[in-house]
Regions:
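N-terminal export signals
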Residues: 2-22
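Core of compact, soluble alpha-helical bundle domains
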Residues: 11-12, 25-161
Length: 161
């Protein structure tokens, strides 16, 4: 928690250092100041990676999600070797969805999730884990709503039952 808050504080300080200058330049040009992107407001990739790290670890041990035989099997046999890469992919996906300078290069979401036959209930439980991670790191409700909206937009690609 301290590392992520420290990373967010560093990112926040950097944003404060950058945005006033861009706001002044915007005033001089007659354009409204640029509003920080969701990516910036989440603390950039440091803040996003901290949230991804937490909710990814919680998904592995979540009893609702572990009722799904395919997820449970993956957690028992694949997670140790593949979870670090999955966390990287999730960080890229969220960073891109939040307006960051990254492009998600993983499998299309429907192909990545097909083998798990995820239900709407399981999708909602992953969303709840994301919100719990955002709360853990003190992310404001506005940013939570925006990120959850991006997550929910992927539901038709992820849910198969």
């Amino acid at each position: 928690r301290t590392v992520a808050k420290g990373a967010s504080a560093v990112a926040g300080a950097a944003a404060l250092a950058l945005f006033p200058a861009s706001a002044e330049a915007s005033v001089e040009s007659g354009k409204p100041p640029r509003r920080p992107s969701l990516y910036d407001r989440l603390g950039g990739y440091f803040g996003i990676a901290a949230v991804v790290n937490r909710f990814s670890d919680q998904i592995i041990i979540n009893p609702i999600l572990n009722r799904n035989p395919a997820l449970r099997a993956w957690n028992e046999t694949e997670a140790e070797a593949r979870l670090p890469g999955l966390k990287f992919g999730r960080t890229l996906w969220i960073a891109a969805a939040a307006g960051g300078p990254f492009k998600y290069t993983g499998l299309p979401l429907d192909r990545a999730h097909r083998e798990f036959n995820l239900t709407a209930e399981e999708f909602a439980e992953v969303g709840a884990e994301i919100v719990r991670a955002l709360n853990f790191f003190g992310v404001r409700k506005r940013e939570q709503r925006e990120l959850v909206a991006a997550y929910r937009a992927s539901m038709s690609d992820v849910v198969t039952e």
